[in-house]
């Protein structure tokens, strides 16, 4: 790994015997990691957010690899497959439909439920259309031998990007896995755009910061577009509501729904700019 990114990320410390974990008598496994004191990346600070994008692109660039496995007689060659978001979002669509049926059958509705029921149909129609388009693109994308993967952080958001005197320090790699880089880029970009009311200028600047280090290929750009297009925020609101007690609905739910609807025009504007 490049020395710059090696210094900027937590590391597992090995035991004297070279093991990266130890297990106690109860079978509980422990690890020891490096750690630096610091504060979370300030999402209101444009320069810090740009630097976080540079760091992510550098991390992806240094951790890219092409899977190769030695051929062994009688043993099938392992295959590393990309995560296909359309499959997960198809599941989300079923959950949204289930919640919509529940709301339609519910006779006594709160103001939040009335408001939610009124907006679900257009969002659900959009979600279904996005999934269909996405599947066609995924199916037409040839996954050839020698395709490049990278090790993703898995949870690259400002909580895990610590600022200290020496610069940024990345922590909590527990969800690290081999996948496409858009897994990380989408998560951070969506969080920052939501916090800035989907400001187009800021979104373009953040994406340009990433691409100044590691340009996206055409498929990655499409992947990012469709991930950002899916109404995941609505699904989160609906999922939390449907799986919790309905006798009392937190005011926070209403606030999140109102904010989502207020940002929808700006979100659509940014997506028109991003569309490949």
Regions found by a protein language model. Give the residues of each.
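ATP-binding pocket architecture of kinase catalytic cores
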Residues: 1-77
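Active-site acidic catalytic loop and adjacent metal/ATP-binding pocket
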Residues: 12, 132-181
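ATP/Mg2+ or Mg2+-diphosphate-binding catalytic cores
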Residues: 235-276
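Hydrophobic packing residues in well-ordered alpha-helices of helical domains and bundles
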Residues: 49-52, 116, 120-123, 203
């Amino acid at each position: 790994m490049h020395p710059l990114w090696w210094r900027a990320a937590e590391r597992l410390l090995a035991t004297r015997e070279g093991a990266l974990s130890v297990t106690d008598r109860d079978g509980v496994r422990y690890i020891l990691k490096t750690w630096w004191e610091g504060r979370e990346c300030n999402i209101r600070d444009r320069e810090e957010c740009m630097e976080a994008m540079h760091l992510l692109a550098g991390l992806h660039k240094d951790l890219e690899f092409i899977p190769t496995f030695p051929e062994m007689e009688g043993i099938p060659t392992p295959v590393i497959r990309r995560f296909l978001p359309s499959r997960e979002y198809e599941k989300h669509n079923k959950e949204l439909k289930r919640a919509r049926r529940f709301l339609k059958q519910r006779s006594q509705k709160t103001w939040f439920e009335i408001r939610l029921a009124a907006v679900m149909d257009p969002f659900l129609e959009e979600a279904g259309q996005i999934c269909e388009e996405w599947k066609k693109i995924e199916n037409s994308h040839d996954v050839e031998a020698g395709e490049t993967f990278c090790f993703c952080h898995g949870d690259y958001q400002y909580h895990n990007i610590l600022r200290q005197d020496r610069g940024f320090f990345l922590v909590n790699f527990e969800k690290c896995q081999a996948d496409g880089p858009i897994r990380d880029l989408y998560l951070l970009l969506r969080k920052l755009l939501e916090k800035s009311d989907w400001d187009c200028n800021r979104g373009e600047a953040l994406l340009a910061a990433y691409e100044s280090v590691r340009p996206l290929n055409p498929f990655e750009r499409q992947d990012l577009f469709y991930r950002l297009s899916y109404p995941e925020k609505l699904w989160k609101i609906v999922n939390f509501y449907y799986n919790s007690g309905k006798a009392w609905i937190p005011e926070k739910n209403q606030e999140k729904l109102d904010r989502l609807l207020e940002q929808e025009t700006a979100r659509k504007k940014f997506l028109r700019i991003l569309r490949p």
